[in-house]
Swiss-Prot record:
Taxonomic source organism: Emericella nidulans (strain FGSC A4 / ATCC 38163 / CBS 112.46 / NRRL 194 / M139)
Name of the protein: Imidazole glycerol phosphate synthase hisHF
Keyword terms: Amino-acid biosynthesis, Glutamine amidotransferase, Histidine biosynthesis, Hydrolase, Lyase, Multifunctional enzyme
InterPro entries per UniProt: Aldolase_TIM, Class_I_gatase-like, GATASE, His_biosynth, HisF, IGPS_HisA/HisF, IGPS_HisHF, Imidazole-glycPsynth_HisH
SUPFAM superfamilies: Class I glutamine amidotransferase-like, Ribulose-phoshate binding barrel
GO BP term, pick one: L-histidine biosynthetic process
Pathway the protein takes part in: Amino-acid biosynthesis; L-histidine biosynthesis; L-histidine from 5-phospho-alpha-D-ribose 1-diphosphate: step 5/9
EC number: 4.3.2.10, 3.5.1.2
NCBIfam families per UniProt: hisF, IMP_synth_hisH
PROSITE patterns in alphabetical order: GATASE_TYPE_1
GO MF term (any one): glutaminase activity
């Protein structure tokens, strides 16, 4: 197979990019020193996290000048995410660190007054030359496709400015802000989105770059769709609770208020519900059109050496065939390995990222960290798992999984915690409640409400909230809409609605009656009652913008 070189400086999930490159017929070779660059033909610069950190790494490693020389030589160069951002002059994220300066513009942070930041999800990358009569686009981009973005800073688009200098520009819109989603000129191609996480649409752009196929025509049908299909889609996430069953097999299971053991039928008497094999099910949901796949390791494999964790192999195998974001939760904490070695949470997360994860989800440890944060007078320690991982990989890499439950009171004055007036009073007629945080899979409650928790972890650097609800788990009665609006009002970071989905209508309700950024389903998919594709079609039929699954490249 022909080869392409990757610069081996970057933190994060490079495995998925390697798998995507292999998928489109190329092999990867690594650039491990600046001197290697002189012999490179095609170069890809991936990147995640902090602009200043990435540019500082490139500078201290002696790579900046060789990269400039590679670009100036006319040989193919592709930048991905921070790899794109590195081409600009500077960024608000770290004003004192200069970029490569290839593109005369500056990156700015998204305005969080009207929307969640980071911008996470599937959005457009539409060539600015396309209009209702058709046109051309570059490197396989399609105005009818969606691509996966995850970033807080972007290059604002100013019509015609870069085009005057010969740049081809594709844009996306987030709220009222239009920004550069992809850009190309001569031998340079760069994307703010992650092609390796953008399904077949992303694989198509990778192949076009590697094959040198810069321009192609857009069909009239695609150009007509451009305006009506532009913008961020409604994300549908498939979640797989993974654990070992009683005979040692790794299985996908599903609980009823977090109880995963059978209560009736042939397996009554406490057998762990076995709903399938994790890798096979993840691939199935990807092919149904899932926008993300989340693995929640609900036993954390406590007696297994860290390097041999079964979840690492699940991620490695899944990332070979699933080209959408993968999140892993469970066991992301400071731990002691079986040989007595102390392993920091950052090292645990790094193993998951190197195995194919894009995000890690932190649960009980986030509650303890929040308690310590308030006890210290809202002073950050810099030592929590959330802080250390987000500093190294960016806040978009850290999800906090929240497991609250309702506590009813007669009036708000009966508790120090933040309450809501609910439309669903309890049997005693109390119509006020607060949401109490729990740990250890819901088995232990803490004197902390859900708003306190999410605001604390946002301050620590979490980039997303996975909002479960113990009262709704396994109920198939719909999401807790009151809880979701309660939490959305408390933070600026994106929130994923979880717990309670039993039919497509529940997804319509949560997107219509809350401002949630995504919605997650589990049991209804595992049991085969509905597919992810059926949920998306239901939403699309009712006017919601969703990503359509595209067939294999």
């Amino acid at each position: 197979m022909p080869t392409v070189h990757l610069l081996d400086y970057v933190a994060g999930n490079v495995r998925s990019l390697v798998n995507a490159i292999n998928k489109v017929g190329y092999e990867v070779e690594w650039v491990r020193s600046p001197s290697d660059l002189k012999d490179v033909e095609k170069l890809i610069l991936p990147g995640v996290g902090h602009f200043g950190h990435c540019l500082s790494q490139l500078s201290s490693g002696g790579y900046l000048q060789p990269i400039r020389e590679h670009i100036a030589s006319g040989k193919p160069f592709m930048g991905i995410c921070v790899g794109l951002q590195s081409l600009f002059e500077s960024s608000e994220e770290d004003p004192n660190i200069p970029g490569l300066g290839t593109i005369p513009a500056r990156l700015r942070k998204f305005d969080a007054k009207t929307k969640s930041v980071p911008h996470i999800g599937w959005n457009s990358a539409t060539d600015t030359r396309i209009d209702s009569t058709g046109g051309q686009t570059f490197y396989g981009l399609s105005p009818s496709s969606k691509y996966y973005y995850v970033h807080s800073y972007a290059a604002p688009y100013e019509p015609g400015i870069l085009e005057k200098d010969g740049w081809l520009v594709a844009t996306a819109s987030y709220g009222e802000e239009k920004f550069i989603g992809a850009i190309a000129r001569d031998n340079i191609f760069a994307t703010q989105f992650h092609p390796e996480k953008s399904g077949q649409a992303g694989l198509r752009t990778l192949r076009a770059f590697l094959d040198g196929a810069q321009l192609h025509s857009v069909t009239l049908e695609d150009s007509i769709l451009t305006g009506e299909k532009n913008g961020l889609t409604r994300r549908i996430i498939a979640c797989l609770d993974v654990r070992t069953n009683d005979v040692g097999d790794l299985v996908v299971t599903k609980g009823d208020q977090y109880d995963v053991r059978e209560k009736d039928g042939a397996d009554a008497g406490g057998q762990v519900r076995n709903l399938g094999k994790p890798v096979d099910m993840a691939k199935k949901y990807y092919e149904q059109g899932a926008d993300e796949v989340t693995f929640l390791n609900i036993t954390s494999f406590r007696n297994c050496p860290l390097a041999d964790l079964p979840m690492l192999e699940i991620l490695r195998r899944t990332s070979e065939t699933v080209f959408v974001p993968l999140t892993i939760g469970g066991g992301i904490r400071d731990t002691v390995d079986t040989d007595g070695t102390h392993i920091p949470a950052l090292d645990v997360a790094s193993m998951y990222f190197k195995s194919g994860a894009d995000k890690v989800s932190i649960g009980s440890d986030a509650v303890v960290a929040a308690e310590d944060y308030y006890a210290a007078g809202k002073v950050l320690s810099g030592k929590t798992a959330i802080e250390t991982i987000s500093k190294a990989y960016g806040n978009q890499a850290v999800v906090v999984s929240v497991d609250p439950k309702r506590v009813y009171v007669s009036q708000p004055e009966d508790t120090k915690h933040r309450t809501i007036e609910t439309k669903f009073p309890n049997a005693a007629g109390q119509n006020f409640c607060w949401y109490q945080c729990t740990i250890k899979g819901g088995r232990e409650t803490r004197d902390l409400d859900v708003c306190q928790l999410v605001q604390a972890v946002e301050a620590m650097g979490a980039g997303e909230i996975l909002l479960n609800c113990i009262d709704k788990d396994g109920s198939n009665s719909g999401f807790d809409l009151e809880l979701i609006n309660h939490v959305k009002a408390a933070v600026k970071i994106p929130v994923i609605a979880s717990s309670g989905a039993g039919m497509p209508k529940h997804f319509e309700e949560v997107f219509d009656q809350t401002t949630t950024d995504a919605a997650l389903g589990a049991g209804m998919f595992h049991r085969g009652e509905y597919t992810v594709g059926e949920v998306k079609q239901y939403l699309e039929d009712r006017g919601f913008l969703v990503r359509r699954f595209e067939p294999d490249v």
